[in-house]
Amino acid sequence: MGASWHQTIRALGSAHHVEVDGSQRHRMCQNEFVEVLNRGKPSVEQIIRIGMDTSKSVFQLHGVNAVEQPILRKKLSRREMVKFFEKTPPTIIALEACGGSHHWARLLSSFGHEVKLIAPQLAKPYVKRGKNDAADAEALCEAMSRPTMRFVPMKTADQQAALMLVGMRERLIRNRTQLANAIRGFAMEFGIVAAKGMCRIEALLERIAADPSLPELAQDLFALHGQEYRELACQIKTLDEKLMKLHRADECSKRLAEIPGVGPIGASLLLMKTPDPRMFKSGRDFAAWIGLTPKDHSTAGKVRLGVITRAGDEMLRSILVVGATSLLQQVRTGRSRHASAWLMGLLQRKRPKLVAVALANKLARIAWKLMTSGESYRQAEGQAQTS
């Protein structure tokens, strides 16, 4: 070994109060170097990376030093964890992107730490054996060290409030749909049917209320269903107004709403649910993040593409596909100005549902371009606005 290696050994031995004579220095290998480094009492100053498994009240920590040796294994309560990181020198902390993780990321960042959020499915392969808090914390610590690891962007409190609005609206719409189906099902038991569409429910309830052949108990129960349906509709309207208020206050959302098939609601959801669009290298990467690109089953040099991956946010993907389907219906009936040669050619070769997904992919790419460039949507010369 060279002189510089021996000098390092002597310095480490002196720093850790370990006596190393000449014969030992000559026999010392890299493993012994690690052993010397870790003799003595480990301190938080040696920690370069911490993985933390979070829960409601118990937090498991796993920290390593510069030579990847575990020097911290602790289980702390909520209060103890906060105090620990307040006193710990700035380091890198890995958290699983789950409930409450964005709150902890903001808090720990305020203490000077660099926080990385890792998706659960990306941390899972690093769990060696069994499922417990210590193994999860170690897996997070190991996963964070990978140079190609992908991380979840930390959300601000305002972003989470906006997503709460979106989630609440989605839940109310789902409840209204379930209630409408229940009303239709119960009405059919008494021989009363209605045409498709949410707009037909009020007329159905009026017919039921005016039908003298129904038992009094059934009339009362249908009245309760009707009251609940109207309350849900009122709550959804209130949330839509809040969503539109946020849309009108944001210039980027206004630009996105100009894209055919997107609209104000779709633009607001795109802006709220999308992290920093500059994270994506291209519009294709953004569409892949939403789950609008085909699965790759290629092998032996043969390219085989299947159905779309359906990765990413389901609601965001649904909004784009529904918007594309609506735009496609207008094109097929001749009521749209956006019938490009590309779109008409695709309609001749492929099924309408497949074309709608392809169009949704193109809408996602256009949205990414507007979000990253700051430009307004404009129609190209001689082309449709969606081409």
UniProtKB/Swiss-Prot annotation:
<keyword id="KW-0238">DNA-binding</keyword>
<dbReference type="GO" id="GO:0004803">
    <property type="term" value="F:transposase activity"/>
</dbReference>
<keyword id="KW-0233">DNA recombination</keyword>
<dbReference type="InterPro" id="IPR002525">
    <property type="entry name" value="Transp_IS110-like_N"/>
</dbReference>
<dbReference type="InterPro" id="IPR047650">
    <property type="entry name" value="Transpos_IS110"/>
</dbReference>
<keyword id="KW-0815">Transposition</keyword>
<dbReference type="InterPro" id="IPR003346">
    <property type="entry name" value="Transposase_20"/>
</dbReference>
<keyword id="KW-0814">Transposable element</keyword>
<dbReference type="GO" id="GO:0006313">
    <property type="term" value="P:DNA transposition"/>
</dbReference>
<dbReference type="Pfam" id="PF02371">
    <property type="entry name" value="Transposase_20"/>
</dbReference>
<protein>
    <recommendedName>
        <fullName>Putative transposase y4pF/y4sB</fullName>
    </recommendedName>
</protein>
<dbReference type="GO" id="GO:0003677">
    <property type="term" value="F:DNA binding"/>
</dbReference>
<comment type="similarity">
    <text>Belongs to the transposase 20 family.</text>
</comment>
<keyword id="KW-0614">Plasmid</keyword>
<dbReference type="Pfam" id="PF01548">
    <property type="entry name" value="DEDD_Tnp_IS110"/>
</dbReference>
